[in-house]
Structures are given as structure tokens and as C-alpha cells.
């Protein structure tokens, strides 16, 4: 009973507390932004519609996050390590959300900043897609019929990622999606912060157009609520999560999701660049 309490209830309770703390910080940030006499003040209210839209946008990367977190939990067992993973992933997701709001509010007239962030995030996502396909190819008895096209796709990704290796090394020197390493408590917090933060940056492409038609406060709450619900599910059923994220079908779908989001990010970067030339 004690093991169950420490292994599941404590991390899940901490997930809820972290959500409430980050929501309070979000509210405070929006108050500060409103104090700057913006041309269009931010409405500090929300409706269910905005919250649901935010959750939907977040869950677009749910497969990606589940793969990352499931492998991280598998490589770092124990309730203390789960606490570190929760803190890192929640703060990473929260800060990514805050950054989207701040950049949109203060720097929407400086599109070059958005181009750089979207481009870097897209490069990282292609590297993560390659690692998913590498893990799939290691499972030699699964989905034999599609191993050849998957191998060809993995080779193409390897070629592209080789070109971008300096960028990958500079921003995420130890990024590895499917072979997470055992880390200390402090290092685990830092590492588990990185991927949710990077995935959040790539969502600039989807977030920014929405901010002109929806309430950003409700949208941001929805993003963080989606993260909280997904994290609780992962903590409540860790063994199932590990089996699921190692399944060949999930690896393929996750890789395709990474590629799709990454290519969309490149497309959005090009569109923004062409609009300012």
C-alpha cells in the first residue's frame, strides 16, 4: 500500500498541484501584460470552448509526449524520479505556453523571432522521428511487410539530420527519444523539461492564428489541463504505458506525427519569411 501511495498517488497529487500553481502564474503573467497598456487588452476570463480547443491542440502531440515520458519512466524507476519527471515536464510545458503568450503579445511585429523558434523546433522533431524509426527497425519480427519503406524513410531522415547536426548538438546535445538514460534527480528535472518545451515551441505555427479569434487565457489553461490529464494517466498505468510506447504501431505513428508537425513548421516558417521579404 505504501509503495502504491508513493508510486502513484504522490506524483498524481503533485501533478494537480503543479497545474494549479502554473495556472496561477499564468494569471499573474496576463495581469502584468495588461498593465503595459496594450492596444487590445487580454480578457482575464475563459469559456469551455477555449479550454477544449487548447486541450485539442495539446493532444496533437500526445503520442510524442507519451513515447518520451514512457521511456523516461522506464529508464528512471521509483517515486522520487517520477516526481522529478512531473516537475520537469509540467514546467517545460508551462513555460512553453507562457512564452507563446508573451511573444505573441509583445513581439508579434517581429516575425523573424517566430521563424527562428519554429525552424529549430522542426529540426529537433525530425531527429526524434528518426529515433522512433530506429527503434522500430530493431524489432525485427514486427510488421515485416513495411520494414523496407520504413528503412528507406529512416535513411532519408538520417541524411537530413546529418545536415542539421550542428543545430541539434547546440540546442539538445543529449536528445534521445527511445533510449532514455538513467539520470540523477536534478539532471532528470532538466532533461524532462527539454522535450515538452521544444514541442511547445513548434506549436507556435498553430497557436498564433488562433489568438486573434479565441480567448488566450482559456486556451492556455486548456493546454496545461491537457498535459495534467495525460500525465495522470501515465502515472496511474506505468506498465501499460511502457508496453504501449514500445509497440511498433505507436513508434510508426509517433514518427509520422513528428515528421508531419516538423514539415508543417518548416512550411509556416517559409510563409512568414516570404511575407516579410
What are the residue ranges of the model-derived segments?
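Multi-pass alpha-helical transmembrane bundle typical of ion/small-solute transporters
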Residues: 1-277
